[in-house]
Amino acid sequence: MEVTPLINLDNHQTPLFWCPLPDFLLRRITEGLFHDLCKGKNQLGIEFGNEYGRAFERYVGRILYEVFDLDRFAITGEQPYKVSGQIRHGVDGIVSDATGNIFIECKTRRMKQGAKETAEGETLEKSLDELAVAVVQLYKNIDDATNGLSEWIPNGRPIYPFVITYEDWYLFTPQVVNQLNECVQHRLEAAQLPRALTETMPFFVTSIGEFEMAGQDIAHLGIERFCAAGVISEYRHFQLSVLVQKAFPNETIVHRHLLKNSWGEIFPKMQEWAGMAGMKEGW
């Protein structure tokens, strides 16, 4: 129903449609256009599904440069490298400071609706295993980097793996998180990597919406201080932006709206409309 939110229950096929979940209809005509784009190709024959992923990676990159002060943080994008003659693309991004490193994998894949509605079952297991593929790919890239196979130069500081997703995966129950960890450990074993990586180098899963806020917290606190608190928190996989409120209640961090110039280009009248509504900001 995410793809076809309008249904016709009439056997005589009269032009009468029902919309059981109006929210699905709204999403279908906005972000749901992805379902149409991913099936097509551009004039060069490149599938839009792949381009969609690339566009998301570029967006995450823009957020990194918007959030992190380059006087204190170093930001590195994707840097392909060769291993035994084969090209590997490596991580999608790395953010480093004097205390630690964040290795980033971007994923547009979403949790299927059926998986969101249950805490068990085949649909959920399949979705979690798809996410586990991304997590293990990130661990593989980190393994290459720490062994000197990539362009990144190891600095001896702790590494925190971050999978940044387009949508939230709602990983807020211990049961679901445990299932995800099991999927990751099975795939780590298949990739001949230590299962214990989930304990020695715990991974984060966060949506880009959450990261836009949490990234500002990281920029304020520093990588190691924020992430060390995060690895022992229930917010490591869900609502990462709430972590600071719970772990650092005495810290005052003023969050700002990001990419204001882009918003102004897309919605040139937004500030005027916001003024009419008595709002300080148009977004």
Positions of predicted regions on the chain:
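Acidic, metal/cofactor-coordinating or nucleic-acid-engaging core segments within structured domains
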Residues: 124-158
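A short acidic/basic microdomain associated with nuclease active sites
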Residues: 67-96
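Short secondary-structure boundary/capping segments
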Residues: 118-122, 175-183
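A short acidic (Asp/Glu
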Residues: 167-177
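Active-site beta-strand-loop-beta-strand hairpin of nuclease catalytic cores
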Residues: 95-116
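Extended hydrophobic secondary-structure segments that form protein cores and membrane-embedded regions
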Residues: 159-166
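A solvent-exposed, charged loop/short amphipathic helix patch at secondary-structure junctions
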Residues: 111-131
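Interfaces and regulatory segments of ATP-dependent nucleotide/adenylate/phosphodiester-chemistry enzymes
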Residues: 1-66, 178-283
